[in-house]
Swiss-Prot record:
This gene is entirely within the gloB gene on the other strand. Induction: Identified when cells are grown in rich medium (at protein level). The lineage of its organism: Bacteria, Pseudomonadati, Pseudomonadota, Gammaproteobacteria, Enterobacterales. The gene is ykfO. This is Protein YkfO.
Amino acid sequence: MSTTYQCIVR
């Protein structure tokens, strides 16, 4: 849930 969130925020 970290990588996905970072990818979306980016």
